[in-house]
Amino acid sequence: MAIKKCSLRTMYGDYPSADYFKDFLHKIYPCKEPFELLVVDKKPKTRAGVYIYDAHRIRIYAPWGHLKETAIHEYAHHIHYTECGSKAHGERPHGPQFWEIYGALMCVAVQKGLYVEERIEKNAKF
C-alpha cells in the first residue's frame, strides 16, 4: 500500500497530513496502543515535536522541518511509554531504552525505503 501524500496548507507552507504520518509510522512498526497525531502550524522556540504521555498524543510542529525524523522520534516515546511497562514510566524520557527503540525504528524506516536522510543522499557517491 502506497502512502498517500495529503497536504496540509499552513501559513508556513504545505505539509503532509496527520493521516499521512500515522500511515508512515504504522508501516515502520504497528504499535499496540492507539495514539493521536497532530501536525501543528506553530513554531515553538525549542522543540520540533512533543509526545504527551497521558493523552497518547504526538504533536509535530511543521515549521521546524525534518518532519519524518520528528515523527519517528515522538513515536518512539509512544512505544516506549505504552509497550515497555512500568519500567519505562520511571526512566528518563531520553534514557537508554528510548534510544534503543528510536534507533530500531530509524533502521527499519531506512531498510524499507521510507526514510532517506537528505544529507546522506546528497553526499553519497555511488
Where are these regions (language model features)?
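A metal-dependent hydrolase signature that marks the N-terminal structural subdomain at the beginning
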Residues: 1-40
